[in-house]
């Protein structure tokens, strides 16, 4: 091997070195190393190691800046961190399968907590410098925007922040060492090739666990200045590439030794703890900080009420702290309850422990927007009902939030316990709704969760009984409202049977229960929100059971429509649901006009699904931000409380058809005709614009086809389009008494088709026989007579009834089609002329109409005297006005002549 790669000894002279270099001159001489560089061992680092090392160094810098509250540098370091993470993304997606490293998520969580802490400290913010204050606002905005992509990872991290990955263990080890090598070391990546180093012998107990580590460690004797090193180098660097590889320093080797020693010590401690266990059973060892289960009481301790309460206070004092094991806290409380029951410390102590267990279960889920786990839900129901049964069974226990902690009494009756079962049951109800929203509504999970409503209502009943015995009016109103909200949307068939006298009059129905609960709230409530929600639920329940007049009177007397805009979103949603159900009730009770008025505000917007909180429209996704969408999803109603939107739209369109089609026929040639229903009118016009219309398929197409048939007076085709097998399945079978609704619809279609027929063809007939109309529309003769009489009285139809002959005599006062079109044409031409005259006046100007015109005024006056250059525009306007007056006078003469002819006819008949 060439002597270029060998190190010369200290005894060699400089002249000999020069000779060696001169004789062995080649290309490799440019890469010759000094003695210091040769001592450094070199290894190849992967891209993952480089990227992770860059991330961890920036994270450590951010932590240092946070300690001294250097916010501008924290901001710049955060920007560097985001750029470094962007560079590391390809490595993360390849090596970690796209899973964000835990140490990076921990850094984001700590940074978010730091910003929130500084931001909430208002006094401290006032003392910040201008630069720090500005940087804090910028940093807060950037962090909030950036962590939106890591919401799921952050939520999982916050559920178990104590668990540390191997990467984080190395980061902690580096920070604890405090050496310079720790600043630049890699956190989260183990070296691909361990360097040889000396390792001390492990303890005897830990020897089996350290076999792998001991295999990797080899003892090397090194002397950098001996001649053997040069010979070793000669043998070691057989390859040119090996010469240029970076090697770890001795300092880094020592750091690695320290880390491994710490891990070994931790393993030894865990193993000793397992060996010292009396039962000798296996224990699952979790990563991260291991917390020993505290002992409840000493063996010889005398367990009494003060001792148990002190232990309870000790357990609950850890509530809300960062490293509290919430599962262990619940287990300790259950154990404490069992100890209390074994030593018969009294029911009051048991109630207190029960209430703290409920609080601990609620605290387990840190994110209040997410539903709790099913195991905790079942446990919560059980503990809640157990506590309430104890309260109801012992009348000498008073549990209230007004009881101060120093005034609690557990030894002598009456017992006073601080707590609020009402707040607990309200939270229970909210958690039940969250569980329902989390499930797929078309799965069996939703059905199984819905079965829990029986237990929830039973729990509410227990709380209601307790507060009826000892509670304020405000507390009773709150618990009554909770019961109302579980009752108002449920249909009770006993109500309709009671109306038909099919059940005894003493039978208690849901309407009676609602009346009792709501009337108490009307009388005793002092908050507007509870009373408003009770009224809305009461109206909804009345409307569901066809109590149209009671529901309508409640709406009119409460004036809800005047101040509902000032209510909270949940109350506005309930108001929309009430109006929708009220419209359905009016339709079932044959009040088509009222049904249309109730539903028009919901349907004209085009988004009834959002207004009723039954889902979000994907078409409007760009109109709302992610935060708004999250809030709106939290407001959604559970699926079993939804109102069928297709049924709602069908009722609205059918009501609009029954009102709009006769109105269109009556005002066919009226240029100023207004639209009763804009939505229905648009559907009708879009169908008329189509060149080829096929048979109807959807619900809307069926209604439009029925409307076209009604315009021709064909009631049979109209009824067939509205009431058929497909429409029955989609819409009408959803009503409670569907046969009665179908009969009502057919009757209305006949009546409105008759009205449309008379409006459309009145100018064709001289007289029409009433029996023939009754036969044509399959209506009783008195009904036809009544319809025509109303039309004549309301001046909708210019005709008279001849009772002896049972005919309707038309008066032909309405213009024919040609006359109506001619009158429309004249009006439009007149309007066009007026517009042109105004435009011409604006172009000419009005200079000569001013008072001070000088000599030109005399000349103009002379011309006017000679009828030259007169006001010809004014003359034309006067002429047009005279023509209009003549047309009006001519029309008045015609009307007068017709009236005289009618009087003559009546005299002749008499």
Swiss-Prot record:
InterPro entries: EIF3C, EIF3C_N_dom, PCI_dom, WH_DNA-bd_sf
Pfam families reported for this sequence: eIF-3c_N (PF05470), PCI (PF01399)
Stretches with biased composition (Basic residues): 882-891
UniProt subcellular location: Cytoplasm
One annotated GO molecular function: translation initiation factor binding
Xref: SUPFAM superfamilies: Winged helix' DNA-binding domain
PCI domain ranges (all copies): 639-815
Main location: cytoplasm
Entry-annotated residues carrying Phosphoserine: 34, 165, 176, 185
Region entry Disordered, spans: 1-21, 157-281, 847-910
Keyword Protein biosynthesis: yes
Bias-annotated ranges (Acidic residues): 11-20, 162-186, 209-235
Top-rank taxon, per record: Eukaryota
One record GO biological process: formation of cytoplasmic translation initiation complex
UniProt keyword annotation of Lipoprotein present: no
UniProt keyword list: Cytoplasm, Initiation factor, Phosphoprotein, Protein biosynthesis
GO cellular component, one term: eukaryotic translation initiation factor 3 complex
Biased composition (Low complexity): 193-207, 862-874, 895-910
Subunit composition and interactions: Component of the eukaryotic translation initiation factor 3 (eIF-3) complex. The eIF-3 complex interacts with pix.
Family: Belongs to the eIF-3 subunit C family.
Protein name per Swiss-Prot or TrEMBL: Eukaryotic translation initiation factor 3 subunit C
Organism: Drosophila yakuba
Gene name in the database record: eIF3c
């Amino acid at each position: 091997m060439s002597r270029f790669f060998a190190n010369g000894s200290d005894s060699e002279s400089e002249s000999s070195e020069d000779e060696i270099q001169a004789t062995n001159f080649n290309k490799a001489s440019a890469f010759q190393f000094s003695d210091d560089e040769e001592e450094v061992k070199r290894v190849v680092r992967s891209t993952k190691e480089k990227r992770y090392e860059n991330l961890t160094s920036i994270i450590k810098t951010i932590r240092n800046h946070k300690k001294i509250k250097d916010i501008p540098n924290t901001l710049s370091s955060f920007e560097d961190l985001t750029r470094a993470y962007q560079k590391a993304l390809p490595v993360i997606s390849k090596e970690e399968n796209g899973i964000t490293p835990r140490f990076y998520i921990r850094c984001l969580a700590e940074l978010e907590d730091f910003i929130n802490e500084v931001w909430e400290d208002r006094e401290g913010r006032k003392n910040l410098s201008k630069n720090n204050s500005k940087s804090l606002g910028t940093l807060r905005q950037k962090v909030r925007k950036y962590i939106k992509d890591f919401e799921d990872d952050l939520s999982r991290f916050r559920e178990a922040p104590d668990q540390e990955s191997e990467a984080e263990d190395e980061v902690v080890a580096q920070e604890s060492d405090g050496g310079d090598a720790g600043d630049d070391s890699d956190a989260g990546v183990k070296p691909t090739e361990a360097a040889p180093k000396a390792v001390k012998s492990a303890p005897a107990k830990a020897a089996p666990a350290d076999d792998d580590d001991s295999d990797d460690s080899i003892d090397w004797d090194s002397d950098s200045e001996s001649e053997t090193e040069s010979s070793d180098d000669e043998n070691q660097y057989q390859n040119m590439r090996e010469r240029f590889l970076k090697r770890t320093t001795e300092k880094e080797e020592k750091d690695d030794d320290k880390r491994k020693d710490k891990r070994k010590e931790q393993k030894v401690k865990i193993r000793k703890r397992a060996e010292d266990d009396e039962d000798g059973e296996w224990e699952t060892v979790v990563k991260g900080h291991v917390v020993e289960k505290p002992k409840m009481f000493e063996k010889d301790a005398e367990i009494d009420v003060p001792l148990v309460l002190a232990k309870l206070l000790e357990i609950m004092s850890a509530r809300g702290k960062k490293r509290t094991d919430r599962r262990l806290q619940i287990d300790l409380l259950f154990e404490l309850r069992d100890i209390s029951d074994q030593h018969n410390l009294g029911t009051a102590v048991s109630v207190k422990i029960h209430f703290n267990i409920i609080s601990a279960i609620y605290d387990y889920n840190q994110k209040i927007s997410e539903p709790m786990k099913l195991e905790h839900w079942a446990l919560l129901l059980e503990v809640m009902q157990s506590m309430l049964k104890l309260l109801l069974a012992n009348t000498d226990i008073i549990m209230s939030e007004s009881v101060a902690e120093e005034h609690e009494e557990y030894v002598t009756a009456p017992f006073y316990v601080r707590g609020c079962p009402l707040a607990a049951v309200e939270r229970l109800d909210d958690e039940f709704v969250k569980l329902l929203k989390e499930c797929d509504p078309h799965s069996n999970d939703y059905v199984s969760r819905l079965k829990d409503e029986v237990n929830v209502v039973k729990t509410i009943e227990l709380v209601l009984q307790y507060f009826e015995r000892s509670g304020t009016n405000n507390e009773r109103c709150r618990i009554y409202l909770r019961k109302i909200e579980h009752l108002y949307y449920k249909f009770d068939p006993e109500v309709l049977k009671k109306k038909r006298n099919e059940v005894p009059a003493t039978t208690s129905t849901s309407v009676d229960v609602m009346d009792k609960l709501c009337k108490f709230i009307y009388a005793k409530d002092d908050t507007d929100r509870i009373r408003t929600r009770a009224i809305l639920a009461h109206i909804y329940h009345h409307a569901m059971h066809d109590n149209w007049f009671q529901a309508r009177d409640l709406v009119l007397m409460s004036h809800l429509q005047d101040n509902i805009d000032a209510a909270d979103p949940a109350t506005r949603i309930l108001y929309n649901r009430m109006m929708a159900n009220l419209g359905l009730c009016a339709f079932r009770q044959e009040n088509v006009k009222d049904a249309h008025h109730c539903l028009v505000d919901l349907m004209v917007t085009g988004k009834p699904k959002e207004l009723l909180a039954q889902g979000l429209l994907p078409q409007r996704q760009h109109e709302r931000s992610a935060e708004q969408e999250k809030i709106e999803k939290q407001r959604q109603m559970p699926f079993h409380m939804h109102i069928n939107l297709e049924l709602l739209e069908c009722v609205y369109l059918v009501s609009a058809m029954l009102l709009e089609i006769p109105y269109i026929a009556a005002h066919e040639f009226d240029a100023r005709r207004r639209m009763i229903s804009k939505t229905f009118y648009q559907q009708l016009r879009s169908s008329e614009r189509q060149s080829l219309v096929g048979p109807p398929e959807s619900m809307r197409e069926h209604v439009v086809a029925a409307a076209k048939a009604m315009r021709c007076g064909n009631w049979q085709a109209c009824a067939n389009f509205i009431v058929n097998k497909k429409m029955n399945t989609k819409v009408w079978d959803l009503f409670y008494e569907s046969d009665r609704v179908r009969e009502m619809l057919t009757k209305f279609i006949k009546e409105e088709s008759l009205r449309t027929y008379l409006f459309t063809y009145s100018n064709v007939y001289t007289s029409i026989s009433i029996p023939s109309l009754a036969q044509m529309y399959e209506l009783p003769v008195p009904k036809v007579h009544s319809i025509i009489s109303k039309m004549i009285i309301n001046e909708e139809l210019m005709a008279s009834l001849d009772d002896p002959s049972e005919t309707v005599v038309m008066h032909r006062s309405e213009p024919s089609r040609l006359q109506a079109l001619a009158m429309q044409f004249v009006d439009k031409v007149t309007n066009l002329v007026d517009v042109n005259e105004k435009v011409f006046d604006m172009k000419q100007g009005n200079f000569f109409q001013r008072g001070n015109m000088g000599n030109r005024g005399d000349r103009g006056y002379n011309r006017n005297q000679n009828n030259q250059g007169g006001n010809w525009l004014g003359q034309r306007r006067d002429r047009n006005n005279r023509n209009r007056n003549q047309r009006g006078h001519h029309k008045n003469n015609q009307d007068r002549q017709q009236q005289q002819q009618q009087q003559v006819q009546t005299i002749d008949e008499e």
